[in-house]
Amino acid sequence: MANGIIIIDKPADWTSMDVCSKLRRLLNERRIGHAGTLDPMATGVLPVFVGRATRAVEFAESGGKTYVAGLKLGLETDTQDSTGQVLAEQSVTCDRAAVEAVLEGFRGDILQVPPMYSALKVNGKKLYQLARKGKTVERKPRPITIFGLDILRQDAPDHYTIQITCSKGTYIRTLCHDIGQKLGCGGVMDALRRTEAAGFTLEQAVTVEQVVQAAEAGQAHSLLMPVDTYFARYPALTIQGKAERLCRHGNGFPWEGENGRYRVYGSDGSFLMLGEILDGQMKTVKNFLELESQE
């Protein structure tokens, strides 16, 4: 049985669900989920959780993410990226200094109106379904945080490569659109690569083709990282005896220690749960009791 985390370098033109469907077949495991959807045109870090490790997805989805994006000025489309229908084109007269000045206004806590071409729902219908019918509905601005927003290079008078570190729920397409609006010339995203998500980086990622090759050699499971690696930021503790018996039956137990979250291991070294100590009592935050170790 496959259990663990695999970081995929998502190829262009694949949906995030396409990747999960492919991995279900390669790993022979139906329980697969990903943390942080990437648009089809985007590439880069897609953390995929396999088997019992899918219990960790809810924690991974909320983390910050880092992207490298192409910002094309002088263009507006209905999708806010270069794949959409062109709505307007303008000449670009602003220089790099003007772009730098505008970027400053997008750093920190801001409000962002989600795009019509998105999977968000309004009255039970996904926005992109309405957009494809030519309909536009009011969307409420949502709070997001842009932790970092920098120009990596200017590729042409009307094109910049930018790096963004942001909170969950940020649409990079919309950020590019809004930057273009602020500059008065319009803007779209014409490339997107995620370099970090949920604490995982491109250096840890493998391609779908690498997974295919490993599966053909009967070694696909060797690409999986144990789920407890995601929780490495929390201190570890090992329990035994009565405490372990109570834990394995889903019960809390007395445990002296500093309040906070811990990785809890059994006497055999297996990862039992993410636990939390509160005033001398250990409780379960999320259990991983059925996870089998990946040798």
Predicted regions and their residues:
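Accessory RNA 3′-end/elbow-binding domains used by RNA modification enzymes
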Residues: 1-13, 17-34, 38, 42, ...
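Catalytic cores of RNA-modifying enzymes
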Residues: 1-167, 172-204
